[in-house]
Amino acid sequence: MNEVEQLVIKNLLLDEEYVRKAMPFIKSEYFADTTGKKLFDILSKYFTEYSAIPTKEALVIEVGQIKDISDDQHHEIVKAIGNIDTEKSEFEWILDTTEKWCKERALYLALMSSIKIAEGNDEQRAAGAIPLSLIHI
């Protein structure tokens, strides 16, 4: 995970107000690697189910329940959880940073999708779908 992704995950684990304001705009696919995606999925599912932020211990237990990851990925996710520090970020700054990151990732993913469509590598969408993918950013 890059630094911004680490900050997003950290604040989702530490700051309930941040979770309530930011989580609706964050998507799993915005994270560049499996570690970030899986951690976000666990945090999101936990918060939706319990309306509370999980402890690090709960996260580790939830990671153990994931079936579609390798042992190496499991180890990386558990290691990332252990590396999360407990210092909250300044609230307005982390919200602004998260908003900017979400916009950048949405644009990047839309552009990558458009390239795939343009090259004929998307079996589900034709070239006419390119403008639609960029409109929905």
Q: Which residues are covered by each model-predicted region?
A:
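Noncatalytic partner-interaction/assembly domains of nucleic-acid and motor enzyme complexes
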Residues: M1-W101
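Conserved small/polar residues in nucleotide/adenosyl-binding loops
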Residues: I135-I137
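A short N-terminal interaction module
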Residues: L43, R105-G128
